């Protein structure tokens, strides 16, 4: 999964987030919350990696 986030265009992030918001529940399950947290982590990690790579390429 992480390699997908590192290489994917931004619209995939929104797709990911939208996918987790498809089923709204008043009390999110632990599993759902874990997946949500994992997806956010992967998104931020991927963005940071992309920024690092673009910075390295700019030099």
Curated annotation (Swiss-Prot):
Transmembrane regions: 7-23
Membrane topology per record: Single-pass membrane protein
General function of this protein: Mitochondrial membrane ATP synthase (F(1)F(0) ATP synthase or Complex V) produces ATP from ADP in the presence of a proton gradient across the membrane which is generated by electron transport complexes of the respiratory chain. F-type ATPases consist of two structural domains, F(1) - containing the extramembraneous catalytic core and F(0) - containing the membrane proton channel, linked together by a central stalk and a peripheral stalk. During catalysis, ATP synthesis in the catalytic domain of F(1) is coupled via a rotary mechanism of the central stalk subunits to proton translocation.
Family, as annotated: Belongs to the ATPase protein 8 family.
Keywords of this entry: ATP synthesis, CF(0), Hydrogen ion transport, Ion transport, Membrane, Mitochondrion, Transmembrane, Transmembrane helix, Transport
Protein name as it appears in the record: ATP synthase protein 8
GO cellular component labels: mitochondrial membrane; proton-transporting ATP synthase complex
Subcellular location: Mitochondrion membrane
Domain of life, per lineage: Eukaryota
Main location: mitochondrion
BP GO annotations: ATP biosynthetic process; proton transmembrane transport
Oligomer status and interactors: F-type ATPases have 2 components, CF(1) - the catalytic core - and CF(0) - the membrane proton channel.
Source species: Oenothera berteroana
